[in-house]
């Protein structure tokens, strides 16, 4: 019943076969696979694999500190797949909670769990849930209620045959507000694992990120676990040697920013990039609306047009024009980050906002100060 060449596998080449199978099993599909109509498989880093394989059997509650671009959401998705397979859970028994609707939509499309925003989690009833994964926890807020206690109570309910998994993924270096998060103080985070190998960003972008992250830790303006983050940064590495590019331009004014973005988008499209490779990120929703009009005007002058859409219903087939906060946890090949001259808590969070924007770019980053 088997092809004849199956009999060619013997003791001499069995090890090579097992090695190849191991590599295949440790891969995950790239978020951007469909860009060229084929599937790319990225290999989990050793640390990502260890975090999944060892802690799955060791601890039910875990804090995962991940530097920007280290694949926290990837690990969260793989973790949910693993607990479903290992414990034979239904997707209704596994709950993923994040702050923003676009990231929720992205995870929902994977069809491996329930996915809700923090606000929906606080308002909803989740009696069937046994396991909870919190992602991007540094940007949660406690204004609508105590999300942490609710999640802890659900996963440690006396009605469960055994405690459920409760994993929290966070990155203090990407904190984008000054309000209480609802998390316990960092001194109460135990046990803790960390991800320090950057897999998302080109080396030029990684170098910029490293510089800004070191500034955040060296001159803290927010309540962050400084010593713990210092240790993470000492271990930070970039997983590849793709150079990419970064361009920082200041004092353009809004019209100048719109002209710059329109011209560069036109150039990228002529080079063969598609609209869905591009994200244009503004600080506030008000600026998203303003730049939509300005960009449309500049594109008409260049006699071309691209579809600009918001992140509704997951990753679209168009260029994204979105706020920085709503794009948290997502990525694009080319990112234009538009940074206003001033905003609320500018002094406290400017460096964090720059890290948030820069870490969304895979290959080409344009930081524009209007």
What are these regions (language model features)?
Residues 1-23:
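Accessory nucleic-acid engagement/destabilization modules that flank
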Residues 13-16, 27, 50, 204:
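Exposed alpha-helical structural elements
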Residues 14-21, 28, 209, 295:
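Generic structural signal of hydrophobic/aromatic residues within well-ordered alpha-helices
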Residues 19, 23-40:
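Non-catalytic propeptide/linker segments at domain boundaries
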Residues 35-114, 118-370:
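Conserved helicase motor core of SF1/SF2 NTP-dependent helicases
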């Amino acid at each position: 019943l088997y092809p004849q060449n199956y009999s060619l596998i013997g003791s001499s080449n069995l090890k090579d076969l097992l090695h190849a199978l191991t590599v295949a099993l440790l891969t995950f599909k790239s978020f951007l696979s469909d860009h060229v109509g084929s599937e790319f498989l990225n290999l989990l880093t050793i640390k990502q694999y260890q975090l999944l394989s060892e802690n799955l059997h060791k601890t039910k509650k875990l804090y995962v500190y991940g530097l920007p671009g280290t694949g926290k959401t990837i690990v969260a998705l793989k973790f949910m797949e693993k607990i479903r397979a290992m414990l034979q859970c239904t997707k209704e028994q596994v709950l993923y909670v994040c702050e923003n609707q676009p990231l929720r939509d992205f995870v929902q499309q994977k069809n491996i769990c329930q996915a809700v925003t923090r606000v929906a989690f606080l308002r909803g009833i989740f009696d069937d849930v046994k396991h909870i994964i919190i992602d991007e926890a540094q940007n949660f807020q406690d204004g609508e209620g105590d999300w942490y206690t609710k999640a802890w109570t659900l996963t440690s309910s006396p009605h469960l045959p055994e405690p459920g998994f409760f994993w929290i993924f966070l990155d203090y270096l990407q904190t984008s507000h000054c309000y209480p998060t609802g998390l316990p103080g960092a001194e109460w985070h135990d046990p803790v694992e960390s991800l320090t190998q950057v897999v998302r960003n080109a080396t030029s972008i990684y170098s910029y990120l490293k510089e800004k992250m070191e500034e955040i830790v060296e001159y803290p303006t927010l309540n962050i676990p400084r010593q713990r983050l210092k240790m993470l940064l000492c271990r930070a590495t970039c997983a590849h040697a793709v150079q990419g590019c970064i361009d920082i331009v200041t004092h353009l004014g809004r019209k100048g920013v719109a002209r710059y973005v329109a011209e560069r988008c036109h150039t990228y499209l002529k080079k063969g990039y598609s609209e869905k490779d591009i994200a244009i990120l503004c600080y506030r929703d008000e600026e998203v609306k303003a730049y939509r009009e300005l960009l449309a005007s500049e594109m008409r002058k260049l006699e071309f047009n691209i579809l600009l859409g918001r992140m509704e219903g997951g990753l679209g087939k168009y260029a994204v024009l979105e706020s920085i906060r709503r794009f948290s946890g997502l990525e694009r090949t080319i990112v234009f980050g538009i940074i206003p001259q001033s905003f609320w808590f500018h002094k406290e969070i400017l460096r964090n906002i720059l890290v948030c924007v820069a870490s969304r770019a895979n290959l080409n980053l344009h930081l524009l100060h209007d």
